């Protein structure tokens, strides 16, 4: 392992420039996973996938986190970029995080010690989120909501194809997919990467795509 390894979660939303990349890559996805519920909080390891967490909470009749189902990647990755879907985002629900800094020291951040906005936070990118504590929601539990949101995803998004999820952030008061459609770029291709016909903010890899194809597109 190189002296400066890259630590990643599930590897979602990463495009490697393979010819020039000589750092070791260490994935945290095989580390011990846990989810714990108490009277007020939901505690989980950072390497739990968003979909697994959402399904667990649904099965245990814990409302408010159905929007996480189908978001690619881990809960730590979602928190680090303030991921969201269906008009919700994760950071307002975070009570605290446990992290390890580049020197191996463990520290805790409370929600009021962090700042966040649309798809961004000020969390140190060189620190690793090892656990997340979320606040339980007091809304009524809807048995059908998770499946309803999943069906909406299937209709509007190419979830069964190889992609990194949405590529571009939405600009203020508009949608990246609409702008790409308006520019006539839906279906455009570079090598093995093409813009989805179902949702223009998705770049699909047909299995032969490279980072060069991605960057050109």
Predicted regions and their residues:
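Anion-binding (especially nucleotide phosphate/pyrophosphate-binding) glycine-rich loop
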Residues: 1-75
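Short, basic and Ser/Thr-rich N-terminal targeting/leader segments
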Residues: 8-10, 93, 161-162
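Gly/Ser/Thr-rich helix-start
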Residues: 10-12, 48, 71-78, 85, ...
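A generic local secondary-structure boundary/capping motif
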Residues: 14, 54-57, 65-69, 82-89, ...
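Phosphate/pyrophosphate- and phosphate-bearing ligand-binding catalytic cores of soluble enzymes
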Residues: 14, 100-102, 106-216
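Structural signature of FAD isoalloxazine-binding scaffolds in flavoprotein oxidoreductases
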Residues: 15-33, 80-110, 124-131
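Short clusters of hydrophobic/aromatic residues that line enzyme substrate/ligand-binding pockets
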Residues: 34-35, 65, 79-81, 116-118, ...
């Amino acid at each position: 392992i190189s002296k400066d390894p890259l630590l990643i979660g599930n590897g979602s939303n990463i495009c490697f420039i393979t010819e020039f990349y000589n750092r070791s890559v260490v994935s945290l996805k095989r580390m011990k996973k846990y989810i714990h519920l108490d009277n007020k909080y939901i505690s989980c390891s950072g390497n739990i996938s968003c979909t697994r967490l959402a399904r667990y909470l649904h099965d245990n009749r814990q409302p408010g986190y159905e929007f996480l189902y189908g978001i690619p990647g881990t809960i730590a990755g979602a928190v680090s970029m303030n991921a969201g879907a269906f008009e919700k985002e994760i950071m307002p629900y975070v009570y605290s995080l446990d992290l390890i800094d580049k020197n191996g020291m463990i520290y805790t951040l409370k929600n009021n010690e962090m700042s966040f906005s649309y798809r961004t936070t000020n969390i140190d990118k060189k620190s690793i989120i090892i656990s997340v504590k979320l606040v339980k929601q007091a809304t009524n539990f809807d048995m059908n909501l998770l499946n309803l949101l999943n069906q909406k995803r299937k209709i509007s998004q190419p979830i069964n194809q190889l992609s990194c999820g949405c590529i571009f952030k939405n600009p203020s008061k508009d949608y990246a997919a609409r702008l790409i459609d308006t520019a006539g770029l839906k279906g455009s291709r570079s090598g093995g990467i093409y813009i989805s016909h179902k949702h223009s903010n998705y770049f699909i890899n047909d299995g032969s795509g490279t980072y060069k194809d991605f960057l050109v597109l």
